[in-house]
Amino acid sequence: MGKRTKKTSNLSSLDKPLRYILNEISNDKQISPNLNNIFKAFEYCSFSSTKVVIFGQDPYFQKNVANGLAFSVEPNESLPASLKNIFKEIQSDIGTLSNNDGYLKPWADQGVLLLNSSLTVAVGKPSSHSNIGWQNFIFEVVRAVNKKKNIVFVLWGNDAKKYIKYIDQDKNLILSSSHPSPLSSYRGFLGC
């Protein structure tokens, strides 16, 4: 398969979710993150620099909270409960925290791809875009990153764990636990 054909086939996995989102927006429905931020994870962490992939479920569903990086919020925003639990575990493991706000772009700058299983959600409706076709695109991303070696895949929650079967555990490391949200963090995230 030539490079041009391969790129086209990879982009075709975006057709269904993007059509859905554009239809929602044309019908005055709000999505999170906003249209300009949907692919920020890939803008801030290039394929070639990726060392770690942290999988979440879907973006924060509150208006203007999600910024395109899984678990991240804009600087000076209050910390969502999931991110508080992530920071609590980092503090517990290494005793310090490099940043005190929820803006995780510095992680992406260091090679951490902060990726949700669904890249969008309807404002006010958690998991609302879990079946609009993001899975095919995310599968393509996992497949591409999996071709590298010594990548750490961090899978938080059942939606993220669906991708385990596509990761070569002989050349990459998988760390998985429950989602860091307060609803499930006690099932294995806290203390992991």
Task: Mark where each language-model region is.
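Short Lys/Arg-rich cationic patches that frequently serve as NLS/NoLS or arginine-rich RNA/DNA-binding motifs
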Residues: M1-T5
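A polyanion-binding, active-site-adjacent surface
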Residues: L11-L155, D159-K162, I167-D168, L173-S178, ...
